[in-house]
Swiss-Prot record:
Homodimer. PANTHER family: N-SUCCINYLARGININE DIHYDROLASE. Pathway: Amino-acid degradation; L-arginine degradation via AST pathway; L-glutamate and succinate from L-arginine: step 2/5. This is N-succinylarginine dihydrolase.
Amino acid sequence: MNAWEVNFDGLVGLTHHYAGLSFGNEASTRHRFQVSNPRLAAKQGLLKMKKLADAGFPQAVIPPHERPFIPVLRQLGFRGSDEQVLEKVARQAPHWLSSVSSASPMWVANAATIAPSADTLDGKVHLTVANLNNKFHRSLEAPVTESLLKAIFNDEEKFSVHSALPQVALLGDEGAANHNRLGGHYGEPGMQLFVYGREEGNDTRPSRYPARQTREASEAVARLNQVNPQQVIFAQQNPDVIDQGVFHNDVIAVSNRQVLFCHQQAFARQSQLLANLRARVNGFMAIEVPATQVFVSDAVSTYLFNSQLLSRDDGSMVLVLPQECREHAGVWRYLNELLAADNPISELKVFDLRESMANGGGPACLRLRVVLTEEERRAVNPAVMMNDTLFNALNDWVDRYYRDRLTAADLADPQLLREGREALDTLTQLLDLGSVYPFQREGGGNG
């Protein structure tokens, strides 16, 4: 059956700021306390969406979350009106204010793990929301992510959206950032590669930075998504690269159809994994980047592998990269050698995503891949699909509501909270989502 990969990109939120909240993500730590530009960040993301849509790659948008997220501050014991809660937390515990104001939901590669209908036992598309248990600021995302996905994939005959796994470290799940699918045409059954960093009883794990994904979580997600057990491989990420800042697998590997583009040191027991994939995926091709050509540290600083690998109708592929790759002489030299070599990659597309990159999120972090048949695509909420009209409407919306300068101190401004809620209220109407945010259901609630 014919099917296409649709990239659902996260729209950067109004409170995009640099707080260094993500230990193990070296860009996040390095840019802590710098001044951010939320308006520019949102426009950089929108431009990537539009240019890819114009190039023939189906593209859609996932909205940001409500931030600052007052309900969690109330859970932490701060009382009063919303304005009083903001004032108290800014004075008494500003780190909590930064956490509940994080715009991290823009990295929708962590929103959920997807199983296309060709891979599932019941023939539906399955989406399991990630619990993002390893980081407090990200663990807040799951309930609203679930509401958003249910509003976008709202046909229950074709889509099953599953709640996140229980919020415990044993079941730490980071979504599609630790998941790849390999195979032939998108509509054919594929091999799902789940990548984990640790498992109970296995001492092979990183020592400097946390392994956020567990094997136990990956196995549970595969069950929830009803993936045919014959179409699943579980593999461990190399703990040494996690300790060098590879906090998700999509920082060291990316797949598309029959191709796996990865670093030579991406996986534990890599040669064994690649042999398994060759045996189980027709036409499998591994493009392994030698450590002698690109150090892991350079892969992390440029986000070479946090790229998008996209298929054209003729079978050739486009590699979508952040500008940092072009600015690194060694990485750019390797990429041009890759273009000249015998493989499906025939074009490099480079985007300026500096605002997101400074927080540790490249092109692949910003998108959730969903393989859909034509019938399934028609069942998706049409208002989220990127086209000229939506692009112009979203740019106008960003111009109207987003600030062009934000510091940690600005998060305590009650006007920022009001701006954010008004913006999201308008956005849910624009995207025909209904009331997906807690403030819409509760009327903003004082107390």
